[in-house]
Design a protein with these regions (language model features):
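The AdoMet/dcAdoMet-binding core of the Class I SAM-like
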Residues: 2-232
Length: 232
């Protein structure tokens, strides 16, 4: 386990909603970080990813994606998590798993630039941290993507992440393959009545997406073309 000092790292809290469902909120209790209805989406995303080999996961949350990853035949499972309350849950969960779990305590934005290990599978689901402000979830993902393609991607590695909007991407097909799957989700109407903020991107849609990138070559062979992701 690797750890280092990061401020503002006790912002999330585990709670139950009025239906006794698990949720993770910010410190105010008014903004939802993760909700129980996301479980089926997370499981579907991991099923599309089909993780193998060495896995890097960003964020633990309620553990939905981590539990799904552990059902596959993997070699190792590295999770980067910064929040103290979430880390406590993660440390209780990790020893009980079938496959080895490596915990890195801190912000992935801090740690990833110096990480040299290569991985076969990636799952990315972060939440804004005040020490690393970003204009959007997409910008967070783009920075993560640009970091891993430089040095962390094995040949035939796959990347999936939580994304609610459809957007265009123009990767060089020599280096990678892009797949976008539609997912119809059942967002409870009562969310808006529970005293928690319904995610803004979910206000008017039941359809979200599961993006999968498959890298045809490893990091050393990709070059600058691998950086050409475009949001549309």
């Amino acid at each position: 386990m690797i750890s280092f000092n990061i401020e503002n790292n006790d912002r999330y809290h585990y709670k139950k909603d009025k239906d006794n469902k698990d949720i993770l909120t910010d410190e105010s209790g008014q903004k939802q970080v993760m909700m129980e209805w996301e479980k089926l989406y997370m499981e579907a995303a991991i099923e599309k990813l089909k993780p193998s080999g060495d896995v890097l996961e960003i964020g633990f949350g309620l553990g939905y994606s981590a539990n799904a990853i552990q059902k596959f035949d993997i070699n190792s499972h590295t999770i980067i998590e910064t929040d103290e309350n979430v880390l406590k849950k993660l440390k209780e969960w990790a020893p009980l798993q079938k496959h080895k779990v490596n915990i890195i305590e801190g912000c992935w934005q801090y740690y990833l630039p110096s990480m040299t290990q290569k991985f076969d599978s990636f799952f990315f689901d972060d939440f804004d941290h005040p020490d690393y402000p970003s204009s959007s979830r997409y910008q967070n993902f783009l920075y993560f993507y640009q970091q891993i393609v430089q040095k962390n991607v094995k040949k035939r590695a796959k990347l999936a992440w939580f994304f609610s909007d459809d957007f265009l991407v123009f990767p060089c097909s020599v280096f990678m393959r892009w797949d976008m799957y539609e997912y119809i989700t059942d967002i409870p109407e009562s969310i808006t009545d529970r005293g928690y903020e319904k995610p803004k991107q979910m206000l008017s849609r039941q359809k979200i997406y599961i993006p999968i990138i498959t890298f045809n070559v490893d990091s050393s062979e990709m070059g600058d073309y691998a950086f050409k992701l475009t949001c549309g």
